[in-house]
Amino acid sequence: MNCFSQLENGIFATEKDIQELKNKDSAHILVYSDSHGKAPVVRDIFEKFGQKCDAAIFAGDGIFDLLALMEKANSYDEISEWLPPVICIVRGNNDSGSYETSFCRAVHVPKKVLLKVGAKRILVTHGHEERVQHSTELLESTANLMDANAVVYGHSHIPVENNHVIYSMNPGSCSYPRSLSKPGCAVLEISEKNIFSIFYKIDFSIFGLKDFVPYFPDRMY
């Protein structure tokens, strides 16, 4: 459960929770991006995966959807239990740089965050400034300059996992997928020697029920 104190720009956690994340031998990180106003989908993602994860990363475009869930968690204990102890957010091209909430007068949202998980340093950014819809070359160069071991990004709305130059992943959009992909999210599995992602697509039944189904993105390198 997250106490919603903004320890530093882009990260909600206590100093203790941040330190515990840095000291972990292995960790599970919930990753999603580009909700674009679909707050109910964000709620479903956290209800399904939040309690099982050590942290959550939102890679931009739809910050208000997450902040709305955090507002509700302030009033409902059940919802607060869905939120992991560390939450990392970055600003997308459709997000504001700051928000006012009941739990934090000024939520400052940076364009980039370097999140330390165990022995890994994860660069989190939306990716629009690095033009990821065309290539990840600039993104990988930025990660190298920041001494990152991995990159999480969004913007393209296309799920991708790339382990060629540096490990990078895009969970795709949880609401508006592109290029015949499915709406979904991912769980980043991190250990001292390895890092990989399990992708989940959201399947909708005729009754409106949602199911999260593991799958391999079409674009993997």
Tell where the protein language model's regions lie, with residue ranges:
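Flexible, glycine-rich phosphate/dinucleotide-binding loops
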Residues: 38, 65, 96, 131, ...
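Short C-terminal domain-edge/linker segments immediately following a structured domain
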Residues: 60-65, 124-125, 152-159, 181-185, ...
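Active-site-proximal beta-strand elements of phosphoester/diester hydrolases
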Residues: 28-36, 121-128, 167-172, 199
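Catalytic metal-binding/acid-base residues of hydrolase active sites
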Residues: 36, 62-63, 94-95, 128-130, ...
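Binuclear metal-dependent phosphoesterase catalytic core
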Residues: 2-23, 118, 146, 170-221
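Core catalytic region of metal-dependent phosphoesterases/phosphodiesterases
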Residues: 2-117
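Conserved beta-sheet core of the metallophosphoesterase superfamily
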Residues: 74-78, 85-88, 132-197
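His/acidic metal-ligating clusters that form di-metal
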Residues: 49-55, 66-68, 100-166, 220-221
